[in-house]
């Protein structure tokens, strides 16, 4: 199970801070409500930074993202033996991270009686600003492609200041390409919290919009594969 613990802990940190920022910004009755898109992008960027640092200390490459893992593995940047431990750690860590956010904000979910009070699946998972399945899919593919293409050129991104560079990359992707879909660019970041929201007793919750969930699953996976493939061809 090489790297499982690092991916589990790193992804858990990522989701606690990232989804936590969504809860803070949206839920009625907390001091951070009504922040803006820049707040969200910065929070997710720093969440990735600290998640990568944690993962690297526990024996993984700090992927925290199935799109990274699958793309890297298919083109020889990661041993195939590491794929399933990494994926399991990522999805399980993301689920537990979402559970922690639910516990942290439980009274606020209770107070948020309607969607206008901020209690909606968008705290946990992504959704399109304008619903257009084809272009939503392309948006996730393109955003993930550029994220992973740059990532491949950072080398070992768990060491030194590299995790900060990864975090800044997330901020740039979010600010420039993420406004269309909320930039999942990570199937585990979307599916595991969406599942937690679906099956756990979150007070006053709405629908989890599983009809959209194929977009943040397969768009990022395709983007990661294309980025790793291009890097292999040109390097």
UniProtKB/Swiss-Prot annotation:
Motif position, NPA 1: 65-67
Keywords (alphabetical) are: Cell membrane, Membrane, Transmembrane, Transmembrane helix, Transport
What InterPro entries does the annotation carry? Aquaporin-like, MIP, MIP/Aquaporin, MIP_CS
- Topological type in the membrane: Multi-pass membrane protein
Q: Which GO terms describe its cellular component?
A: plasma membrane
Q: Where does motif NPA 2 map?
A: 186-188
Any one Gene Ontology MF annotation carried by this entry is: glycerol channel activity
Where is this gene product found? Cell membrane
What are the transmembrane regions? 4-24, 39-59, 62-82, 83-103, 134-154, 165-185, 210-230
Name the domain of life. Bacteria
Name where it mostly resides: membrane
PROSITE patterns xrefs: MIP
**Protein family membership:** Belongs to the MIP/aquaporin (TC 1.A.8) family.
Q: Any idea what job this protein has?
A: Transporter that facilitates the transmembrane diffusion of water, dihydroxyacetone, glycerol and H(2)O(2). Is not permeable to urea and D/L-lactic acid.
Write down the PANTHER family for this protein, in alphabetical order. AQUAPORIN OR AQUAGLYCEROPORIN RELATED (PTHR43829), AQUAPORIN-9 (PTHR43829:SF9)
Any idea what this protein is called?
Glycerol uptake facilitator protein 2
Recorded source organism is Lactiplantibacillus plantarum (strain ATCC BAA-793 / NCIMB 8826 / WCFS1)
- Taxonomic lineage of this organism? Bacteria, Bacillati, Bacillota, Bacilli, Lactobacillales
**Gene coding for it:** glpF2
